[in-house]
Amino acid sequence: MTSDKYLDGGLNALQRCYKSFFDKLSDKMGSAENVSGTYDDGGSHIYLVWSVAVYAEAMADSLKFTNKYEKKFENVFQCLKRYWSPEYNACCASYYFQGNNDVYFDDNAQVAIALATAGYYTSNSSRKKHYLDRAEAIIAFIINQGWNQQKGGVAWHVNSGSPPHANLNACSTAMCSLAALRLAYAVDDPKKKQQLVTFAWNCVQWIESNLVDHTGLVCDGLSLNNGKWDLDSTKFTYNTGATLATMALLLGFNDIIKGLPNIDKIHSYLENMASAALNTSGEMYDQSCKTNFKVWKDNTFFAQHLSEGLMGFSFAMPNSSLVKSAQQMVFDQADFVMNHVRDPKDGLYFRDLNIYKISPELTNTFNKIFHADQHFQPDKDERVQGSGPVEKLPLCKSLIGSSGAARMLFPAAEIIARKNNPQSGPILGGRPASGEKDKGCFIC
């Protein structure tokens, strides 16, 4: 236990996920029940790579604060290898088999973020090389095969980047730019840093030009229909949050970004987007809330990115008048998640911040907290998958729900850590590497 409830909460969520969803004998991550985000692999309910990636990101985040889970991260790394496609040099959505082309760029960006972050913070040089080599392979795949050479932006899936059914998404473009920067912090080669930072800035400019609308928030993406690119104006916390986080990280590369085109706009981009993200009358907030504090209208594994983005903004732009509000929003959302999305029976988390989608009891809680008048709206993803009325199916917890919650708590913990030990710049500095190979490291 530490003196920080957010750090303790995040670490506890990781440990409970490890005990509940990781099979140490087979290096598999799955569920005893058929829950959302799993697929049937010979009778076992195995998690799709997205869930494992979010858990890996949360594990990597923990290394900023403690080496407690360094060995466990190796186990997760072994698990991720089961999804690895040698054809793509990236992870498939499910376990790899020859001919498996179900490969998503946003999934792989989150895998790369986990590996690059772990590589940056690990205290062992052997692990660092293994993690960063794999992260570099993924980023090369993203840049070479994901970026649309004609329109710009990053495709969602390897089969959705070109006509007749092309999609260029905020989730993929923002997450890939964030992954590139996490890797740029971890590598030493100046040329590689330059290439990664340039790619990330290109992604930000594309998002600003194509997906940011009059609200100042990031829309979901572009779809090609009958030769015309149509904008999906849906606003998810994921997209605005990841874009904020990317811009915050960019400001840590002062010497590199000086020569980038239009880089003088980055501060206004950041300020305007943070302001929009903090507008509680906006689309990312649940407007059924009648109180000053409104919960985000999303799930934990989307909202995690907005927590990270607002936290990053607050340290990248320390003189902004929005810093205090941004940090308070991170705390308030984290408090809500710990108090109401966490199931005290097992310490794991549900998925929805809009808890009226979980149970009648939590609907009553929501209405009481927010002076709202919501009706119970059962979400099938909060329940064991099956037939019959959704509300009759048993409630369940998932890897991605709890991992997303952990990643909402760690930004709050980072704010506290920096207040106790002031440190400038957009990211916490890495713990010093040992420079020695770990003989007990079974990935070496």
Residues of each region from the PLM?
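The core hydrophobic/aromatic register in alpha-helical repeat solenoids, strongest
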Residues: M59-S62, L115-A118, A180-L183, V187, ...
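Extended ligand-binding groove/face enriched in aromatic
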Residues: K71-A186
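Oxyanion-binding "anion nests"
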Residues: N239-D255, G259-G282
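CBM-like carbohydrate-recognition segments
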Residues: T2-A58, S62-D106, Q145, G152, ...
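Inter-helical turn/loop segments and adjacent helix faces that build the functional surface
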Residues: A118-S126, L183-Q195, L250-P261
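Active-site cradle of extracellular carbohydrate-active enzymes
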Residues: C171-A180, K193-L249
